[in-house]
From Swiss-Prot:
Enzyme class at the top of the EC tree: translocase
GO MF annotation terms: ADP binding; ATP binding; proton-transporting ATP synthase activity, rotational mechanism
Chain sites annotated for binding ATP: G169, D170, R171, Q172, T173, G174, K175, T176
Any Pfam family: ATP-synt_ab
Job of this protein: Produces ATP from ADP in the presence of a proton gradient across the membrane. The alpha chain is a regulatory subunit.
Annotated protein name in UniProt: ATP synthase subunit alpha
Gene3D superfamilies hit by this protein: 2.40.30.20, ATP synthase alpha/beta chain, C-terminal domain, P-loop containing nucleotide triphosphate hydrolases
Subunit and partners: F-type ATPases have 2 components, CF(1) - the catalytic core - and CF(0) - the membrane proton channel. CF(1) has five subunits: alpha(3), beta(3), gamma(1), delta(1), epsilon(1). CF(0) has three main subunits: a(1), b(2) and c(9-12). The alpha and beta chains form an alternating ring which encloses part of the gamma chain. CF(1) is attached to CF(0) by a central stalk formed by the gamma and epsilon chains, while a peripheral stalk is formed by the delta and b chains.
Organism the protein comes from: Shewanella sp. (strain ANA-3)
PROSITE patterns xref list: ATPASE_ALPHA_BETA
Keyword terms: ATP synthesis, ATP-binding, Cell inner membrane, Cell membrane, CF(1), Hydrogen ion transport, Ion transport, Membrane, Nucleotide-binding, Translocase, Transport
């Protein structure tokens, strides 16, 4: 078969027209060293700090050290098969995670991939894990409460929406239990929750997820997991991933609560990465920027104003503020709050709840030490009735501690001192609360009212718990309208006080506890 010149020319023209030019500018480099999850790459001339680097097998590394002739990157995942000479590429992207309502009720890893076996996630888009926190002008003061359901916390150390309240204490003092109860208490409050588990056992996390499901709180909670067996890079990044997921709700005029459990393990993971990258160690072998590690994370928890939300949503949401409340957890060693990471996080947050081993072992749970626990901004957000009634609780407990120590050496005590001791020991007993049993505002108000107005005076110490349970049951059945009113409004006036007093007088007369 012979083709003439015209046919050949037409065929070439046709081929040229059909040819599609696909150009992709990708910077390529070569791995020159692999050790302990850290790779050194030569040849990446154009790479950003924190950029994702594509590795073979759908894996990524994050560029952390940008040096003159090489790049130090940390691998997110297994690295045993990586070897010298393997080609890698830049992506031009910072790490992003999926965000949206589709994540609620799901358990995901640091990268936002589902690990609960419930199928793919229907996300609303992606968000970078590292975001600059809202500025001063974009924020609004904290004046709405987050009810934890704990009398000891809501009365003495109140937390507001947009606040950062540290939960600090030794191991096995009830830190996680307090945070999980706070999440369970948001079941009907409309606050979306994010629980970030860093460096924990998989069995512990499975137990937490099961408890959240049992109490109906998993449906409005996202669980982000980086277990102890996962790469240090994933443990270091997990809190930032969870924060990005929580910010999705804040920026759309909603309220969210995030628990970081715990930031001590995140700091250890970051220390490991920094030392392997040959960064100079500082105090306790942590790198120099460990303060910035936590400050840039916790500053993202905030209450943003109406203008910020309106601008972010392009006018879709107007007249609403958004908030992200953070409950970071720090584990201390032998109660040493003056160590490097605890002092850093105490100085960043808006207050701390200090849980003590001695109190926990003595049966006082939650083991809150009211002497050194404080909330710096929550007072403005406290529910009116709790604020009015709880003023004397902290004073009573502080005086009781002081007098109890003094009374060990004094043989005879005057009546006033003995009365203070009696009152203090009963208030301490009243502050005890079982796990997974958060209390409503009205229930807390009734209990505190009973303590403040002297109704516990004639109650045996070991019967205080029974007295409270019977009292709450009585008030719920006989004064249901009052309980409903307090729960809905949180108000306190002469009428409410009179009805509470009348209810308690009747109950005490029955002696049914």
């Amino acid at each position: 078969m012979q083709l003439n010149s015209t046919e050949i020319s037409d065929l070439i023209k046709q081929r040229i027209e059909q040819f599609e030019v696909v150009s992709e500018s990708r910077n390529e480099g070569t791995i020159v060293a692999v050790s302990d999850g850290i790779i050194r790459i030569h040849g990446l001339a154009d790479v950003m700090q924190g950029e994702m680097i594509e590795l073979p097998g759908s894996r990524f590394a994050i560029a952390l050290n940008l040096e003159r002739d090489s790049v130090g990157a940390v691998v997110m995942g297994p690295y045993a098969d990586l070897a010298e000479g393997v080609k890698v590429k830049t992506t031009g992207r910072i790490l992003e995670v999926p965000v949206g309502r589709g994540l609620l009720g799901r358990v995901v890893n640091t990268l936002g991939e589902p690990i609960d076996g419930k199928g793919a996630i229907d996300n609303d888009g992606f968000s970078p894990v590292e975001v600059i926190a809202p500025g001063v002008i974009e924020r609004k003061s904290v004046d709405q409460p987050v009810q934890t359901g704990y009398k000891a916390v809501d009365a003495m150390i109140p937390i507001g929406r947009g606040q950062r309240e540290l939960i600090i204490g030794d191991r096995q003092t009830g830190k996680t239990a307090m945070a999980i109860d706070a999440i369970i208490n948001q079941r009907d409050s409309g606050i979306k929750c994010v629980y970030v588990a860093v460096g924990q056992k998989a069995s512990t996390i499975a137990n937490v997820v099961r408890k959240l499901e049992e109490h109906g709180a998993l449906a409005n909670t996202i669980v982000v997991v980086a277990t102890a067996s996962e790469a240090a890079a994933l443990q270091y990044l997990a809190p930032y991933s969870g924060c990005a997921m929580g910010e999705y709700f804040r920026d759309r005029g909603e309220d969210a609560l995030i628990v970081y459990d715990d930031l001590s393990k995140q700091a250890v993971a970051y220390r490991q990465i920094s030392l392997l990258l040959k960064r100079p160690p500082g105090r306790e072998a942590y790198p120099g920027d460990v303060f910035y590690l936590h400050s840039r994370l916790l500053e993202r928890a905030s209450r943003v104003n109406e203008e910020y939300v309106e601008k972010f949503t392009k006018g879709a949401v107007t007249g609403q503020t958004g908030s992200l409340t953070a409950l970071p957890i720090i584990e201390t060693q032998a109660g040493d709050v003056s160590a490097f990471v605890p002092t850093n996080v105490i100085s960043i947050t808006d207050g701390q709840i200090f849980l003590e081993t001695d109190l926990f072992n003595s049966g006082l749970r939650p083991a809150v030490n009211p002497g050194i626990s404080v909330s710096r901004v929550g007072g403005a957000a406290q529910t009116k009735i709790i604020k009015k009634l709880s003023g004397g609780i902290r004073t009573a407990l502080a005086q009781y501690r002081e007098l109890a120590a003094f009374s060990q050496f004094a043989s005879d005590l005057d009546d006033a001192t003995r009365a203070q001791l009696e009152h203090g020991v009963r208030v301490t007993e009243l502050m005890k609360q079982k796990q997974y049993a958060p209390m409503s505002v009205a229930a807390q108000a009734v209990s505190i009212f009973a303590a403040e107005k002297g109704y516990l005076k004639g109650v045996e110490l070991k019967k205080v718990g029974d007295f409270e349970a019977a009292l709450l049951s009585y008030m719920n059945s006989e004064h249901a309208a009052l309980i409903k009113l307090i729960n809905e409004t949180g108000d306190y006036n002469a009428d409410i006080e009179a009805e509470l007093k009348a209810g308690l007088d009747k109950f005490v007369a029955t002696q049914t506890w």
